[in-house]
């Protein structure tokens, strides 16, 4: 009888609450790499979610895809730092003042190929001539010095180190540019302009500010999202084996600020790309099933559980969240993206919102753990939250107090 009463009481509790409350999420065994700035420097903090402190602080730089190298530039010297020990493994004296190109609008450094075998450094500022260095990371050696008349900035380097993609500004005042290919073996610019294969075949001036980008797993594509004043945002799908690209227009709300809130997430097989904008409540799916023709297959307004229309309006001061504003589960079934405030869990089968979390946070950056079990969110005050990828359960929240946040660079197994 006692067992029966306990069973009945248990059922009553479930019926009264609707479901059994989920257990709190235990801290995962991971290390976080956060880029931050202080009054005196920019840095990369290595953070332990268990102890909730920064175990080490390193100079701001570009992390290799495997997390084994941190490349930094200081005082005309390129350094290869072991992120785990903090020791300088190798260094290379540079022939002048060069910098790591930015990978995101928020200032996270880039310049690496998808496989991490090549690194490009460039001079800064709009000048009458442009200078870059192509470096083999295996040897930490300059293989090519590129000197060009005009204003060029780095866009991408392919995995073979033979094709350097550059943005050439044709009108600095208007912000017009075009994409060119520097043929490394020939030591010269190709005589062609990278064309929009989805257009009319005629090169046209491009405009826009690059927010962030993601490589395909095979290194054949670089997908970048750009915001344009008055024209909405677009995804620039750049083929890194041939001189062509696709420009895929994203929905335009008419608000210039909204265009700065697009983020990209790519499935593990590289076939499905999601462009998400929490400020607009919009998600666009781009498929590249054959590996040659990326195209928009659907766009949907995402209803956010418990949110009002006003909750989908962000201010332009938080535009840097475009660095890492969306992540996917390993199976591609769940998309987590930043909303106006907090995070939104989206079912990719229907592109409908399932739940939301951290509704009082302005999320600055977002990454997933390598095993796909955790989501780590960084807010504008530098606090970090750990959540479950499958169901959004909350884990710990803490502030490691490493400085003003720039973004999360990497999550790796502890």
What is each stretch, according to the model?
Residues 14-16:
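C-terminal motif of bacterial Sec signal peptides marking the signal peptidase cleavage site
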Residues 20-70:
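An edge-strand/N-cap motif at the start of beta-rich repeat modules
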Residues 20-24, 57-68, 73, 97-112, ...:
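Repeated scaffold domains used in trafficking and secretory/extracellular systems
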Residues 28-30, 66-68, 115-117, 160-162, ...:
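Short coil/turn segments that connect the beta-strands within blades of beta-propeller domains
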Residues 38-41, 77-79, 124-129, 169-174, ...:
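Short glycine/acidic-enriched loop and turn motifs that connect beta-strands
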Residues 48-59, 87-101, 141-147, 188-204, ...:
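A short beta-strand motif characteristic of beta-propeller blades
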Residues 48-51, 83-86, 136-140, 184-187, ...:
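Short loop/turn segments that connect beta-strands within beta-propeller blades
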Residues 378-414:
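Blade-level signature of beta-propeller repeat domains, shared across WD40, Kelch, NHL, RCC1
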């Amino acid at each position: 009888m006692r067992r029966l009463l306990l069973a009945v009481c248990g059922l009553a509790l479930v019926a009264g609450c609707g479901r059994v409350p989920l257990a709190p999420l235990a801290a995962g065994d991971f290390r976080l790499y956060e880029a931050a700035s202080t009054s005196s420097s920019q840095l990369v903090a290595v953070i332990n979610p268990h102890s909730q402190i920064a175990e080490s602080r390193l100079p701001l730089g570009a992390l290799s895809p495997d997390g084994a190298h941190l490349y930094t530039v200081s005082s005309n010297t390129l350094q290869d730092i072991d992120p785990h020990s903090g020791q300088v493994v190798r260094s290379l004296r540079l022939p002048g003042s060069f910098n790591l190109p930015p990978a995101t609008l928020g200032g996270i450094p880039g310049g690496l190929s998808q496989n991490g075998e090549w690194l490009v450094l460039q001079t800064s500022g709009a000048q009458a001539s442009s200078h870059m260095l192509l470096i083999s990371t295996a040897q930490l050696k300059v293989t090519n010095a590129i000197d060009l008349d005009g204003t060029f900035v780095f866009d991408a380097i392919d995995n073979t180190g033979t094709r350097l993609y550059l943005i050439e500004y044709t009108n600095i005042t208007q912000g017009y540019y075009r994409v060119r290919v520097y043929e490394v073996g020939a030591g010269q610019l190709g005589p062609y302009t990278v064309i929009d294969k989805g257009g009319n075949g005629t090169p046209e001036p491009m405009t826009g500010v690059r927010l962030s980008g993601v490589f395909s797993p095979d290194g054949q594509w670089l997908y970048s999202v750009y915001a344009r004043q008055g024209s909405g945002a677009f995804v620039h799908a750049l083929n890194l084996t041939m001189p062509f690209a696709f420009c895929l227009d994203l929905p335009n709300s008419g608000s210039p600020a909204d265009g700065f809130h697009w983020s990209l997430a790519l499935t593990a097989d590289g076939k499905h790309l999601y462009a998400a904008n929490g400020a607009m409540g919009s998600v666009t799916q781009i498929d590249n099933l054959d590996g040659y023709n990326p195209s928009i297959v659907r766009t949907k307004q995402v209803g956010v559980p418990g949110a009002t229309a006003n909750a989908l309006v962000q201010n332009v001061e938080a535009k840097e969240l475009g660095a890492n504003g969306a992540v996917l589960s390993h199976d591609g079934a769940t998309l987590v993206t930043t909303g106006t405030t907090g995070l939104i869990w989206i079912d990719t089968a229907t592109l409908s919102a399932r739940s939301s979390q951290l509704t009082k946070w302005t999320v600055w950056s977002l990454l997933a753990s390598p095993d796909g079990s955790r989501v780590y969110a960084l807010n504008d005050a530098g606090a970090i939250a750990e959540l479950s990828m499958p169901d959004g359960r909350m884990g710990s929240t803490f502030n490691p107090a490493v400085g003003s946040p720039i973004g999360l660079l990497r999550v790796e197994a502890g």
